Amino acid sequence: AAWEKFDVIFSEEVERACLIHGDLNVGNIMIGRGYRLTGFIDPLNSMYADREYDLFQFDNLTGKRFFLSETYRRKFGASQYCDQKLAFYGLWNEVFCYIKSGVLVDLIMDPLVKNMGRRLAEL
């Protein structure tokens, strides 16, 4: 079912690719005094891609506590199907990790599959 909606979800053309971190989560964001952003670490998956790719991890771990997704969307906006794209990106990332490691972590994969189902139902 997910692939049947792929063309709808990714129908909005990406204006331009930008350099993304590829694994942007709260553990890879450096914050200094006064809560100022000082840098990013662990850029092993950096690439030029859709700028929204990095957003899928903003709600992982403790990201929701820091309102990262909401802050980003307020400052930069989001595509029409951003939530559905993020569900795809999150699921793809876990499949990619599985391919690289051979380890499937149900604790991570199950919520991603459920989220994908919820996002598809919104279409």
Residue ranges and their predicted role:
Residues W3, R65-S69, F88, M109, ...:
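A structural signal for well-ordered alpha-helical scaffolds and beta->alpha junctions
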Residues E12, Y81-C82, R118-L123:
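C-terminal, non-catalytic tails of nucleotide-sugar-dependent glycosyltransferases
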Residues A17-I20, N25-Q84:
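Active-site Asp-x-Gly
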Residues L86-F96:
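Hydrophobic alpha-helical segments that form the core
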